[in-house]
């Protein structure tokens, strides 16, 4: 196999033109930086956890690019292209990583609070009555889905229009991705018992791919567009 990339928590190898192998490490990544300490068997845990959720989603009819687990800390996945020049992405582009992080928020916390204070987001945008003073930890009346960039050095918040233009998505495709995110969260709720306890910031994120038949996603995944045009997801480790 050919080693093609070193990430913060995994090594990436090319198996063949259509297949990659992820080798999960015991590294710890905090605020996009690797710290000196390691956690024994963390890589194995990440790999097994990803396989577990991909298996559940596959049974639910949600496509993903998991192929196999050749060892306890390695995963083989279908390869997709990463296109950094967004001007080359349109509705006809296939087999590429959709350059968006799709974030589903359930509580007022983290950066959402900062944007509420600055007026960039209003209470009514979140389903509250106009003028309501949102407090830290308030449960949102409805899940709030938004997108940030995925391939930039730092995540940047995007409007719906900006996200669709950057990723080459139609209105229908964009809504389908959001619906899939909510479906996955409902599956997590069923399996884990509490869909809204994933992080201290009250959010769950999903990055996507487009190939051609369908899209899908997983918790902390990347979206891709497949050959038939619809989105699905790919794994992300932290």
Give each language-model segment a name.
Residues 204-238:
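Catalytic activation segment of kinase domains across protein kinase-like and atypical kinase folds
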Residues 19, 196-199, 211-214:
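Coil-to-beta-strand transition motifs
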Residues 103, 199-203, 216:
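A structural signal for short, well-ordered beta-strand segments and their strand-loop junctions
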Residues 1-148:
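Active-site loop/lid in soluble adenylation, ligation, and acyl-transfer enzymes
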Residues 169-200:
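A long amphipathic alpha-helix within ATP-dependent nucleotide-binding catalytic cores
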Residues 138-170:
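A short mid-domain helix/strand-loop element embedded in enzyme catalytic domains
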Residues 10-11, 203-205:
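Short acidic loop-to-beta-strand element that houses the catalytic metal-binding Asp/Glu
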């Amino acid at each position: 196999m050919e080693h093609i990339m070193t990430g913060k928590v995994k090594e990436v190898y090319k198996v063949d033109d259509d297949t990659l192998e992820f080798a999960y490490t015991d590294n710890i990544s905090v605020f996009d930086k690797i710290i000196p300490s390691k956690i024994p068997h963390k890589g194995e845990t990440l790999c097994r956890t990803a396989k577990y959720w991909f298996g559940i989603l596959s049974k639910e009819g949600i496509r993903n690019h998991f192929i196999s687990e050749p060892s306890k800390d390695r995963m083989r996945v279908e390869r997709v292209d990463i296109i950094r020049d967004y001007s080359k992405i349109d509705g006809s582009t296939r087999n590429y990583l959709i350059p968006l992080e799709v974030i589903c928020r359930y509580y007022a916390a983290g950066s959402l609070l900062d944007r509420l204070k600055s007026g960039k987001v209003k209470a009514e945008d979140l389903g509250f009555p106009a003028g309501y003073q949102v407090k830290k930890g308030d449960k949102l009346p409805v899940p709030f889905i938004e997108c940030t960039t995925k391939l930039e050095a730092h995540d940047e918040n995007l409007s719906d229009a900006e996200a669709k233009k950057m990723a080459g998505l139609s209105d229908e495709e964009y809504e389908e991705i959001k619906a899939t995110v909510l479906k996955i969260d409902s599956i997590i709720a069923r399996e884990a018992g509490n869909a809204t306890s994933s992080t201290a910031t009250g959010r769950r994120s999903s990055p996507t791919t487009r190939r051609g038949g369908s899209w899908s996603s997983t918790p902390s995944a990347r979206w891709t567009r497949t050959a038939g045009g619809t989105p699905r997801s790919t794994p992300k480790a932290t």
